[in-house]
């Protein structure tokens, strides 16, 4: 099947930081063509037939807020748009949210383990209310890849966040943690329609049967294709969906249509991609 493809989950860095970004996550590689920089993402997109990628910057330290988002803004192209990074403990977080709105960022990315925050903590309720007011879609790293970490977030935490931000699209990365190490106390049941999951790393970590079972239970209308470039492979993640037993219409929902609907609500869907 041939259709549009939107990759909701990619990461690119300045050249000076790209190698370090790979080392920190245990993906050290000396091949320049495999570094997470814009030129390499564009090349992988062309190879995989991806029409649009969303860059997800991570602000690991509050003092890096401005620098990280300036780079994210500067690196955007017609086929690469960017969410803004936000550290919940940055000074004047409400003001920083207004800045991200002024910068016309497409949404907000959080990574609790890297940022060392419990996003569901009541002290962040004001931040979540402001995000809800501004209408930002949010994409959050979920679960853990290798070992359990103190700040890992699971669906139970999302349920708490929804009390302060009930209206915005919330995208739970890594299939809501279920393509990572399993937490037997967690599930994806009874989450509202504005909560989505992406497929980042699922092609690499999930068996095909389990991958499809999770999606069928959650609903193809709430699943977004994501590769987690450079840590995941765009071609493999796309093939996992295309080779599945879902209908062509359901595959299109996951590969681009669901993401397009979210991006359209914030005016970030390119004109060449029509719903």
Report residues per predicted region:
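A cross-domain feature marking catalytic cores of carbohydrate-active enzymes
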Residues: 10, 57, 84-88, 110-112, ...
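Conserved, mostly hydrophobic/aromatic
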Residues: 9, 45, 72, 100, ...
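A general structural detector for well-ordered alpha-helical segments in enzyme core domains, enriched
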Residues: 40-44, 68-75, 96-100, 123-127, ...
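Active-site environment of divalent metal-dependent phosphoester hydrolases
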Residues: 12-16, 60-63, 88-92, 115, ...
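Mid-to-C-terminal alpha-helical segments outside catalytic/metal-binding sites
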Residues: 1-11, 17-52, 217-224, 235-275
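Catalytic pocket-lining loop regions of alpha/beta-barrel enzymes
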Residues: 106-107, 120-224, 272-274
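Active-site gating/metal-coordination segments in enzymes
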Residues: 51-52, 62-146, 152, 205
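N-terminal small/glycine-rich loop or linker at the start of catalytic domains
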Residues: 12-22, 68, 74-78
